[in-house]
Amino acid sequence: MKKLSLIIFFFIFQFSFSQSIEDQIKNIEQKVISWRHDFHKHPELSNREFRTSDVIAKHLESLGISVKRNVGVNGIVGILKGRKDGKVVALRADMDALPITEKNYLPFMSINEGIMHACGHDSHMAILMGAAEILSNNRNFEGTVKFIFQGAEEGPPPGEEGGAKMMIKEGVLNNPDVNAIFGLHITAQLPMNKVYYKPKGFYASSSRFTIKVIGTQAHGGTPWLSVDPIIITAQIINSIQTIISRESELTKEPAVISFGKVEGGNRFNIIPNEVNLVGTIRSLDYGMRDYIKKRIIELSEGIAKSYGGKAIVEIDDGADITYNDPEIINKMLPSLKKSAGNENVILSNAKTLAEDYAYYLNEIPGFLFELGGYNTNEKREAPAHHTPDFFIDDSSMLLGVKVMTN
């Protein structure tokens, strides 16, 4: 009954909008673009989104939206009440940038050295700010909208808390209690003006692992006096990749192991004492994730021991699997199709990306969808996320505002 009443509320909420909403959205497109450019020019890392959160809070306050600052470090929560009491729907965007030096020579290129919005969070914020403006000017709906601007989606710095987990811990889904939550992620490789969705598991879980390989240091000219941690590390890297290719049933669900950092040694003629590895595990099945974690430990320790060395493995779970509620998706598809057009709402495959948005979905129903950000008329290829060349087309954001508003 709870879910049924929530669904009925959605239809009341959508039905209340006048036909002029679409015109209003078109009228603020340049505003949305300018917000995105501003955020892109002034990116801030996880748990350091000070300027970013202030810009957002001031915008929401200017709309007459009740604002709470510093939720989960720098998170912003805005509450907009409709004409009557009713259910509470949350809309979420993430705010943090990445430690990447931008190579896009744009008028709004990052001015913060070594920091870049390379995953589209600048557009997520701009889209949700646009939706907040439209909804604040059209309060003839029943219920309440809670705008959640969250920091540290990419993960808080070592030794700090942050992200969705901390916002939930600090009560972002309460006072008033949220009945359902919706969010989007723009994707640079997908054609713009299209929306992509998947019921059940959509984005993968994410785990971070570190492996310290300890050997015996020696002169590069006398390797027989060493236990070479670089050789051990090479064997560990190759063997760990066989966990996916030879031990995982990929017809069941996809899984990925990637190494992001290998660090060891400080001089060409010294065999170092240790090498450190850092990597990520992605899986859409918790049983598979647990098996991969177990095998990483077994292989690392076993290989190191066989060479006379030692491996110390630490694995920390990050985001859970992003589980989209199938019933809510089915009931919301008419709204998506109304916003984007029937042919532009596309059933997607599962992705081995990860999103801490999953933690909200562990608490309440909702879903995350993808928004295409690539202009197929572009002469250059669509860039990968988390790279210095990442970009999205500004005009792709308009559909995002439309969907989040509807």
Feature locations, PLM:
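Bacterial Sec-dependent N-terminal signal peptides
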Residues: M1-S20
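Acidic/His- and Gly-rich active-site-bordering loop/insert found
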Residues: Q19-H117, A126-E142
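Sec/Tat-exported extracytoplasmic proteins
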Residues: E29-V32, R36, H40-P43, G64, ...
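Divalent metal-coordination and catalytic microenvironments
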Residues: F39, G78, L91, H121, ...
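Metal-dependent amide/peptide-bond hydrolase catalytic core
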Residues: S62, I231-N406
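Acidic-glycine-rich active-site phosphate/pyrophosphate-binding loop
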Residues: D94-P107, F202-K212, Y374-R380
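Histidine/acidic-residue-rich, glycine-tolerant segments that coordinate divalent metal ions
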Residues: L106-M116, S123, F141-K261, N266-I270
